[in-house]
């Protein structure tokens, strides 16, 4: 694989969150590098985002699928089967990507050839004190050991599914995500880490969820 030009597949499971999908897709139209496709998988939603996806088809290489509700792991596996990329990047629907996110991924893959990678999310300076406190409790090494994917680490690095990438051949060798509805990302990450495949933190800051923090933000990479 040519790491400089590897095609990336962004896999995004969605459940009843069309507004978040619109913000995420809008951030993807602003990427400085465009060697990616977007695979949206609607996980049995009653409030679908199909109309949102259709509005972006002239701006992005984006596909939409609707499947019966089976949980995020099942939706990610379905999306992976539809994908064409050399690498899969798994995102939550509430992410907002900084303009150089894809550029940063390409740079890290070219330099390291990592099998798996990931990065943190972070609160914006404009967040309220309560929103910042929630973010700190979920990302600080003092509270969780950096469980949500901080760049530095106290122990082994386990990318999390809100901002996680993996070589597609590695994903296939592992058999995909578990159908369990919670913790499937950590269970998925355990085998490659134990087998010493290269998994590394990548400095890729994301915007914060409207649903979780009450305000969507765009953050530059490296925060």
Enumerate the language-model features and the residues they cover.
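N-proximal low-complexity "stem/linker" segments adjacent to membrane-targeting elements
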Residues: 1-30
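Cell-envelope/extracellular polymer assembly enzymes that use nucleotide-activated donors
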Residues: 6-9, 37, 187
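Acidic donor-binding segment of Leloir-type glycosyltransferases
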Residues: 25-66
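Glycine-rich, basic loop-to-helix element that forms the pyrophosphate-binding segment
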Residues: 67-83, 104, 158-162
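Short aromatic/hydrophobic "clamp" motif used to bind/position activated sugar donors
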Residues: 88
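Conserved donor NDP-sugar-binding/catalytic core segment of glycosyltransferases
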Residues: 100-132, 136, 195, 200-205
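A recurrent flexible, glycine/aromatic-enriched loop bordering the glycosyltransferase active site
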Residues: 123, 144-165, 169, 180-182, ...
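Catalytic donor/gating beta->alpha subdomain of glycosyltransferases that bind UDP-sugars
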Residues: 178-223
């Amino acid at each position: 694989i040519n790491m400089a030009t590897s095609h990336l597949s962004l896999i995004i499971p969605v459940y009843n969150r069309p507004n978040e999908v619109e913000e995420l897709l809008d951030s993807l139209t602003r990427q400085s590098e465009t060697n990616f496709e977007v695979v949206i998988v609607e996980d049995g939603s009653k409030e679908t985002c199909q109309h949102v996806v259709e509005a972006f088809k002239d701006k992005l290489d984006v596909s939409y699928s609707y499947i019966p509700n089976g949980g995020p792991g099942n939706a990610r596996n379905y999306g992976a089967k539809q994908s064409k990329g050399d690498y899969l990047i798994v995102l939550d629907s509430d992410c907002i990507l900084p303009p150089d996110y894809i550029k940063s991924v390409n740079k890290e893959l070219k330099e390291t050839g990592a099998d798996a990678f990931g990065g943190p999310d972070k609160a914006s300076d404009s967040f309220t004190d309560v929103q910042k406190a929630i973010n700190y409790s979920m990302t600080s090494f003092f509270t969780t050991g950096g469980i949500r994917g901080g760049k530095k680490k106290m122990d082994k690095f386990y990318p999390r599914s809100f901002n996680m990438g993996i070589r597609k051949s590695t994903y296939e060798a592992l058999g995909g995500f578990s159908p369990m509805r919670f913790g499937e990302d950590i269970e998925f990450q355990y085998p490659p880490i134990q087998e010493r495949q290269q998994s590394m933190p990548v400095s890729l800051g994301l915007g914060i969820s409207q649903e979780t923090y009450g305000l969507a933000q765009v953050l530059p990479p490296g925060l």
